[in-house]
């Protein structure tokens, strides 16, 4: 087994943990199965772009409230996902035992969003959204979402550790068909804190 800079790591020191994801944790959406970018994007200059971020899985793993870094291999303080999205392997900082820490995974794409689009004149105040498995770049579904609605007021909310998009207040995606007369946007976001995203 090799570590950074070709430094030998003894198998006795290296502690890698495996967690098989229970499908019951997910309601129609397993973020560990979905990559950040879902389709070919014309705006990406592939020969000049490191595609790692785009091809990482949307699911995240947290240890004591802090995210582990998603990597392809076994680096300390990191995790990686098997190709089928059903098993997560992780290595904690200092090769710690997970029984001594609080381990969390993301289970949902969004924390707060309406079931139907175009709702209007809604006020959301003081809500905290954490650990959303949102994707990027489109569709832009935030941890807190207006889902194409209009005239929302979102204030004094906190978004913590969203994978990609914290708050969305627009059309979500430029591919949506424009409906004549339909109002989207015109929302106010104030006093909110988006951190560690």
Q: What positions do the PLM features span?
A:
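Short coil/loop residues immediately preceding or within conserved phosphate-binding loops
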Residues: 141, 184, 189
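Extracellular polysaccharide-degrading/modifying enzymes targeting complex plant/algal/animal polysaccharides
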Residues: 1-148, 152-153, 158-160, 166-168, ...
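Short, intrinsically disordered, charge-balanced linker/junction segments flanking boundaries
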Residues: 189-197
